[in-house]
From Swiss-Prot:
The keyword Amino-acid biosynthesis does not apply. HAMAP family: NDH1_NuoB. It comes from Chloroherpeton thalassium (strain ATCC 35110 / GB-78). Belongs to the complex I 20 kDa subunit family. This is NADH-quinone oxidoreductase subunit B 2. NDH-1 is composed of 14 different subunits. Subunits NuoB, C, D, E, F, and G constitute the peripheral sector of the complex.
Amino acid sequence: MGLLDQKFDKGGVVITAAENVLNWARLSSLWPMGFGLACCAIEMMATNASNYDLERFGIFPRSSPRQSDLMIVAGTVTFKMAERVVRLYEQMPEPRYVLSMGSCSNCGGPYWEHGYHVVKGVDRIIPVDVYVPGCPPRPEALIGGLMKVQELIREEKFAGDRREAIERLKPKKVKAEDVIVETSASAKKLQEAAS
């Protein structure tokens, strides 16, 4: 017996908004692309193992950005790697989401104060939707972050001009030199505040 063989109390019609159906389909088939850069990647790989079974949430990891709708940035993002992170993000189709996993990708981690080579948070180069704290976060925390992304998708509205929203979400072109100048300026402020 299937669902359509059963009688409905008030007729045989189900009414809902089209955006609810689209959001349900997108959140039930989330395809993340893992971008593992350091020790957080080990925990991300553990999350993909059979102990946690991400497929029960409809999450199927992909290795190509062109097939992914979620980028998981796990680990330390250096200035050399920042350009590649932006390039992969730009190759992802819309709508796209970013999950920042671990202290290093959230805010620079232990390299925050003295690491001249580390981006002080991946949100300086691409927009981040969900942050997962920890050093490194446990697989359970990553699963919680993935469920938070699914909640964001469930509540998304398509009303209004979508092109304007897409333009607002597009990352600005960032060069490593600009971030280095900004970082050195903030380092000077920290030194002045310490003295």
